[in-house]
């Protein structure tokens, strides 16, 4: 169970980082 939670949080974290990186590339 803990692995599933960790994977879910990690994928969510990766998505947030991808969105931030995308926004930075668009705004600059």
Curated annotation (Swiss-Prot):
Q: Which residues carry this modification: Threonine amide?
A: 28
Q: Which GO terms describe its cellular component?
A: extracellular region; neuron projection
Q: What is its main location?
A: secreted
Q: Which GO terms describe its biological process?
A: adenylate cyclase-activating G protein-coupled receptor signaling pathway; epinephrine secretion; mRNA stabilization; prolactin secretion; regulation of protein localization
Pfam families assigned to the protein according to its UniProt record, in alphabetical order: Hormone_2
- Disulfide bonds listed in the record: none
Q: Where in the cell is it found?
A: Secreted
Keyword Acetylation found: no
In the record, the note on similarity to other proteins reads: Belongs to the glucagon family.
Protein name (Swiss-Prot/TrEMBL): Vasoactive intestinal peptide
């Amino acid at each position: 169970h803990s692995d599933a939670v960790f994977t879910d949080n990690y994928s969510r974290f990766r998505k947030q980082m991808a969105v931030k990186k995308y926004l930075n590339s668009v705004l600059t």
